[in-house]
Amino acid sequence: MSERVNDKILEKAIERARERNIIIPTYEQMRDPSRVPESIKEELRGIGLWDLHPRNLFRITWKNDPETGGFGGVNYLELPQELTGVKARIFVLLGRFFPTGSHKVGATFGPLVSRLVTGAFDPTKQKALWPSTGNYCRGGAYNSYLLGCPSIAVLPEGMSRERFEWLKKLGAEIYPTPGVESNVKEVFDKTKELKEERPEEIVVLNQFEEFENPMWHYAVTGPAMEEVYLKERKGGQRLTALFLTQGSAGTLGSGNYLRERFPSIRICAGEALQCPTLLYNGFGAHRIEGIGDKHVPWILDARNLDMVAGIDDEACMHIIRLFNTQEGRGLLRDRGVPSETVEKLDLLGISSIANILGAIKMAKYYEMDGDDIIFTVATDSMELYQSRLRELGSGYTETQAACDFERYLKGATTDFMAELSYWDRKRIHNLKYFTWVEQQGKSVEELNEQWYDRDHWRKKLNGYKRTDELIREFNRRVGLI
């Protein structure tokens, strides 16, 4: 969505922004906060990272400085060989330092903002509905609040307690649906029901089909990875691989950016082994919150994948205990993992562990050495999963920690991985038909365009440039800068 829809509604959005002291950042500023006006940087010094203040829209970036409250370099962590067991260098971008503690505020920024600046969303009458299995609705409700827009969250009742508490704090309407992480159809069904009941009031912002989701990662996350690579590479080291578990497939938009910059990169999409939709056309429930929803997202560019992999949720649950208990951390130090790394392991949430395991599996599968660099992300931190940690119980011992370290980290294997041929990629792409054409109203023509139009994804993902023009015009008319 890149052109004006309704000038009268646009004027209402501008007036709401003026009343609520709202200034919208551009994608360019989120990628490079040095472009943020000094007056806004000065305001941010007195505003907390999670505060419900509209200026925190400018903190939707990988470059928040947790020490000063200003901006700095990309927040990331390199995992040493003593921890991973592989020679390849693995870098993890850290989502903990975004507002809400997750980079999902980026994925939810575009769908709502693109409508506000084109007059496609009336903040005085309409509500933004965020269907989700986790952090997406948290980020969406947060951005809605900052942008002066009422919100609705639809998510499975089995998600962590921390998610529901946060949504209540934001005043969102909350509709829990039956099931857990992979029960996305129930979320879709409730969303459809609410939309039919309140067609004029509700605007559905579905992360699985909104191209502004991967567009944000193409414009912001991909360049952040490139920046870290250029800073950290030594000698003949090369950017070899990207591993990302996929729920909505938004983060994989960074892979489209990296493919343009580094054509030989290998990109692997991960999912829970207990719900191997991409790997085996499979299904099932699992415990890796935020990924694997028993369908192929509309916004997944299957052509850009080289590999898919299944990550055992049992491994992830064992490793969060290893990383977040006194016994586990003591064991890691004894095994030579630097204390500086050990003290930061709480920056890795459950899906982050899955990403790290996937990166290790890729390093082993392709027999990578010290000249290879792999990137992944930590969507969030353990701050959002303390209830899950408590559910695992107490009484964790050093012996258990040693077993978990050897079995799940050092013992990570190359099973449940598949390199993709042309027809493997097309098989994954064709699975979109059953969710999106049969159930969600998309057309076969749209589906085929995604596959056969070689320029389709480039045009979609570069839409942020036009959106930036509209944001600047919107801010000019609001008149606060």
Question: What is the predicted function of each stretch?
Answer:
Residues 1-481:
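PLP-dependent amino-acid enzyme catalytic core
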